[in-house]
């Protein structure tokens, strides 16, 4: 059968537009015997952008050599070199008749892919666990924020309670001081009344003795006057005076004059004693008033110093509270910054992991497709080699018949030679395609190795993030411990102040209880004073003088009270200034709390960014769908090429034996 009877020239599959890769070929004549060698430059345009790896593989294929008639140079042992700058494919047919392929199935093994998939699964599990841990940490941070807010509210309530307790303590202290002053005044008055009573008793005894003497002198003078009257009356009735009568009269006159002189002396001494008593009482009262005023001034100074110390203590407490508030603000700022950095790192890692997962899945699909196409090409090459063996055997069987009819079959031999050359060229194209597939496979393997290396880098980043998360957890625990210690200290201070308040209350009640018998004693003293006043009505002039002095001392006491009121006003002004400073600190704290309340808006912004990342992920998934469509198109083209190869095999089978 001739080549024309077999349905014309056989169809060869093109490796250009319909193939997987586009090839630009340059043919250069470089052979040891002057035969042309083919130089092919390959540009891989399909697939992902990656690093190209130079691959040099030598595939030795036993091709069928066409029969040459005598007189022509034999084409045996002619080497065909495929040369390319990035990777060179050399095809040198050996002298042996058996076809030996250097390409093995181990080159296309999937063990590396399985190990890579296992590693990817492990990485995915680790990433999921890390994501869960980050979610747990986020929930813990939210819980801690809630606890901090509750603690802040608790602290504010405790501060209000402390302020109320401080006000009550100030009031009770004021009441206690007033009660103490009253009790001390009552004690002083009681002591003064007792001393005055003793002194008055002594003076009373002295005056009573002097009065008794004066009364006795007056009674004696009165008796003498009565006797003188009697004698004068007798003399008037008798109207005659004897010498004895004159002597008695003179004697009575002398006695009367003596009695009057003694009475005047006793009266003078009594007046002197009364004058001295008045002067002594005036000086003593002035000294006592001076002492009481000095005591009151000293008490006012001590009270002022105590109030200044209390104000300094309150200022120190306010400064400590402000420092604690600033520390809490700094801690809240650091916690918010750490949470923000964690969220940003989490989003960045999620985006990177998604991109790497998509790229890995895409690379795995492409590697699988390339392995399938390589296996198919290998099967096709083996089929073509078997066809060539069959053709060689047929040529050897027909050799004897061709020798007999060499002249008649010369044209047919030339046609078969041309057809063999075409098959040789087609086989070279197939080998070139296989080499391209192997190079792409190697490039994908290198890219897969790069992806594995990136996975390792990501693992290191994950370990660093785990360390950072543990550091953050430790910092959070330290912050919680500090908050607990501050809370415990505040509770202890509150308990101490409540204990002091209860002690002040007990002392106040005790003072009130001791105040009742003191009032009774005071009433008794007033009764005794009234009795003494009733017995000393003769000394009203002295009392008027004393009243004028008492008015003076009252005026001085009013001046001291005015000074005390001024001190109280100054204390109130200082307290108002402290309250204003505390309110300013509160306002500042509330403004900083308002700044902290802006954290949910920032979280919303980050959630919006996450939504944008999810939209980008959906776009990448759409691109993946488009790429799968392209891969299906390529598969359909490969099937068409397989159909063409089957038709080529059929055409080879129809060749004349």
UniProtKB/Swiss-Prot annotation:
One Gene Ontology BP term is: spermatogenesis
Covalent link location (Glycyl lysine isopeptide (Lys-Gly) (interchain with G-Cter in SUMO2)): 138
PTM per Swiss-Prot/TrEMBL: Tyrosine phosphorylated. Phosphorylated on Ser-95 by TSSK4.
Name the major location.
cytoplasm
Q: Which residues carry this modification: Phosphoserine?
A: 73-74, 95, 106, 109, 115, 129, 139, 261, 632
Q: List the GO terms this entry assigns under cellular component, sorted alphabetically.
A: centriole; centrosome; cytoplasm; microtubule; sperm flagellum; sperm midpiece; sperm principal piece; spindle pole
- UniProt-annotated location(s): Cytoplasm, Cytoskeleton, Microtubule organizing center, Centrosome; Cell projection, Cilium; Cytoplasm, Cytoskeleton, Microtubule organizing center, Centrosome, Centriole; Cytoplasm, Cytoskeleton, Spindle pole
Keywords from UniProt, A to Z, are: Cell projection, Cilium, Coiled coil, Cytoplasm, Cytoskeleton, Developmental protein, Differentiation, Flagellum, Isopeptide bond, Microtubule, Phosphoprotein, Spermatogenesis, Ubl conjugation
- Note the InterPro entries from the entry: Odf2-rel
Q: Which residues carry this modification: Phosphothreonine?
A: 92, 110, 231
UniProt feature coiled coil, ranges? 144-423, 461-635
Complexes and interactors: Self-associates. Associates with microtubules and forms a fibrillar structure partially linked to the microtubule network. Interacts via its C-terminus with PLK1. Interacts with ODF1. Interacts with MARK4; the interaction is required for localization of ODF2 to centrioles. Interacts with TSSK4. Interacts with AKNA. Interacts with CFAP58. Interacts with BBOF1. Interacts with CCDC38. Interacts with CCDC42.
Q: What does this protein do, in the record's words?
A: Seems to be a major component of sperm tail outer dense fibers (ODF). ODFs are filamentous structures located on the outside of the axoneme in the midpiece and principal piece of the mammalian sperm tail and may help to maintain the passive elastic structures and elastic recoil of the sperm tail. May have a modulating influence on sperm motility. Functions as a general scaffold protein that is specifically localized at the distal/subdistal appendages of mother centrioles. Component of the centrosome matrix required for the localization of PLK1 and NIN to the centrosomes.
Which family is annotated?
Belongs to the ODF2 family.
The name this protein carries in UniProt is Outer dense fiber protein 2
Q: What high-level taxonomic lineage is stated for the organism?
A: Eukaryota, Metazoa, Chordata, Craniata, Vertebrata
């Amino acid at each position: 059968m001739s080549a024309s009877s077999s349905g014309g020239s056989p169809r060869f599959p093109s490796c250009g537009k319909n193939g997987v890769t586009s090839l630009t070929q340059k043919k250069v004549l470089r052979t040891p015997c002057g035969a042309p060698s083919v130089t092919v430059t390959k540009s891989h345009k399909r697939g992902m952008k990656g690093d190209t790896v130079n691959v040099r593989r030598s595939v030795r294929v036993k091709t069928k050599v066409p029969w040459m008639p005598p007189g022509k140079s034999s084409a045996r042992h002619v080497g065909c070199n495929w040369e390319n700058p990035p990777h060179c494919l050399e095809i040198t047919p050996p002298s042996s008749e058996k076809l030996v392929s250097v390409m093995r199935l181990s080159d296309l093994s999937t063990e590396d892919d399985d190990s890579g998939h296992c590693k990817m699964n492990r990485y995915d599990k680790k990433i999921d666990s890390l994501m869960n841990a980050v979610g747990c940490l986020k929930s813990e941070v939210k819980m801690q924020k809630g606890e901090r807010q509750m603690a802040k509210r608790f602290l504010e309530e405790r501060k209000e309670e402390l302020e109320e307790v401080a006000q009550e303590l100030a009031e009770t202290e004021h009441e206690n001081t007033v009660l103490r002053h009253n009790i001390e005044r009552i004690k002083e008055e009681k002591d003064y009344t007792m001393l005055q009573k003793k002194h008055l008793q002594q003076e009373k005894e002295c005056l009573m003795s002097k009065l008794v003497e004066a009364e006795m002198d007056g009674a004696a003078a009165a008796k003498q006057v009565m006797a003188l009257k009697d004698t004068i009356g007798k003399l008037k009735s008798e109207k005659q005076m004897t010498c004895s009568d004159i002597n008695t009269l003179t004697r009575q006159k002398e006695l009367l004059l003596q009695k009057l002189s003694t009475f005047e002396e006793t009266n003078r001494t009594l007046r002197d004693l009364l004058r001295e008593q008045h002067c002594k009482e005036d000086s003593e009262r002035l000294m006592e008033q001076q002492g009481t005023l000095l005591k009151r001034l000293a008490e006012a100074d001590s009270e002022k110093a105590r109030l200044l110390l209390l104000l300094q203590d309150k200022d120190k407490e306010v400064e400590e509270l402000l420092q604690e508030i600033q520390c809490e603000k700094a801690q809240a700022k650091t916690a918010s910054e750490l949470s923000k950095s964690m969220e940003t790192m989490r989003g960045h890692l999620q985006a990177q992991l998604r991109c790497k997962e998509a790229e890995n899945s895409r690379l795995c699909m492409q590697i699988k497709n390339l392995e399938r196409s390589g296996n198919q090409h290998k099967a096709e090459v083996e089929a073509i080699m078997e066809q060539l063996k069959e053709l060689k055997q047929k040529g050897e069987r027909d050799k004897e018949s061709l020798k007999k009819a060499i002249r008649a079959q010369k044209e047919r031999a030339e046609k078969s030679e041309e057809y063999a050359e075409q098959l040789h060229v087609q086989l070279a194209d197939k080998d070139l395609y296989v080499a391209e597939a192997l190079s792409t496979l190697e490039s994908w393997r290198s890219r897969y190795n790069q992806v594995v290396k990136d996975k390792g880098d990501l693992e290191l980043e994950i370990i660093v993030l785990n360390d950072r998360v543990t550091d953050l957890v430790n910092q959070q625990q330290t912050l919680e411990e500090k908050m607990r210690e501050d809370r415990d200290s505040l509770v202890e201070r509150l308990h101490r102040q409540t204990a002091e308040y209860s002690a002040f209350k007990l002392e106040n009640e005790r003072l009130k209880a001791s105040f009742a018998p003191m009032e009774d004693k005071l009433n008794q003293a007033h009764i005794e004073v009234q009795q003494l006043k009733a017995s000393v009505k003769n000394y009203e002039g002295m009392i008027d003088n004393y009243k004028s002095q008492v008015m003076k001392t009252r005026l001085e006491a009013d001046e001291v009270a005015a000074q005390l009121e001024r001190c109280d006003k100054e204390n109130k002004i200082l307290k108002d200034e402290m309250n204003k400073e505390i309110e300013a600190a509160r306002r500042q704290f509330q403004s900083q709390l308002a700044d902290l309340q802006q954290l949910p808006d920032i979280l919303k912004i980050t959630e919006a960014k996450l939504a944008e990342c999810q939209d980008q992920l959906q776009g990448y998934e759409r691109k993946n769908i488009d790429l799968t469509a392209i891969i299906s198109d390529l598969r359909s083209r490969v099937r068409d090429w397989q159909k063409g190869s089957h038709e080529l095999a059929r055409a080879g089978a129809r060749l004349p034996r």
